[in-house]
Amino acid sequence: MGYGWAGILRKYVVEPAHMWWPSTLVQISLFTTLHEKEEKKDGKRPIARVKFFVIALVCSFCWYVFPGYLFQTLQSISLACLVFPHSVTAHQVGSGMNGLGIGAFTLDWTTVASFLFSPLVSPFFAIVNVFIGYALIIYLVMPVSYWGLNLFNAKTFPIYSSDLFTAQGQEYNVSLIVNKKFEIDFPEYEKLGRVHMSTFFAITYGFGFATIAATVTHVALFYGREIYSRYQASSREKPDVHTRLMRNYKDIPSWWFYLLLAVSILLGLVLCIFFKKDVQMPWWGLLFAAALAFFFTLPISIITATTNQTPGLNIITEYIMGAILPGQPITNVCFKTYGYISMAQAVAFLSDFKLGHYMKIPPRSMFLVQFIGTMLAGTINLGVGWWLLSSVENICHKDLLPANSPWTCPGDKVFFDASVIWGLVGPKRIFGSLGEYSTLNWFFLGGLLGPVVVWLLHKAFP
């Protein structure tokens, strides 16, 4: 479905010159370095670009052996933990793995670029924005919430954890509250008690609420007029040089995208109707997820194209379906997959279109390569995942794996915990009137109003 959204929205986030997609410029720089002919300057030939690239590649590979395999401590060095190795507070404050990471640093580039991607790619204003948000949360919000206010009984739980806990701080045994249909067992849930989270995990969800609300407001205020004008008269707008050159190629017929979108939705409906016992999502859930993905693809694509930061749609999709059909985690996961993943796929496809736009790759060739690549990657990834699950003993079970095992699946653990929070237990029993974290819903309002303040300041001080 993401390819269909991308085809519909190309003229809004690919053709405009100011939708520059920072990450694509890095790829273009690499391709140019490897393929352009070099000219002598002042009769001297500088070091060949390819030679420099190979040297940097070899040096990077050799260095990664140390933090990646031989001395993994280099991935996160905490000064506070080194000075006070037996202090719990020092570990909470200074640990880069299980704490706030204040004063910690890394000598591993993959650690730097693993979550928010390379800081060398994002524009300076976006980096400053991310750093201010990081400093606000880590240096102010978290210390005040944990040590000052003991917010949500923070001291009962680890300061930094994505696990779920009981009210006494013990790990929540999710298997006890799941019945044979993979739905919540209410009598057992009442016995075990409410689900609790670490304060950091809870605040992360709060800022996630604010992020998705701020995305809509920001795009409406800063880009709403332009989107409307392009919708009204895109054909009369003077194209930039890249768009003019790309018109020398045959464009992709719109029906390619519409057909692919229709087939994808039809196959999804077949799964929902004829494999309802396995998928557990009603047919209207698929259509709702598709509509939600289409609505958010444009604003999130604009944010990505101008800042290299991509807000996630996972929280809002989980929240909505969890409120509509609580107690059904499989339904929630399927809804999130169709809503969030299709949007993420659309953003990635639009980024590839912009790369082809810059490099003057024929649009039809770009479409076919991406489509075939997606089919191959999807099949291979499924096969590799199935092979790992059947060949690696105790994979993703951290307590049963040997020390320093690479198969702990932290991302999948968060995905599972999210399915418990939003699908199995439901937002009403966690973020609603029956839960401990209802105050976090105010973050939605903060996210809606935040960009308004920035927009007013921008108008007053352009």
Question: Which role does the model predict for each range below?
Answer:
Residues 1-462:
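Alpha-helical multipass membrane-protein architecture
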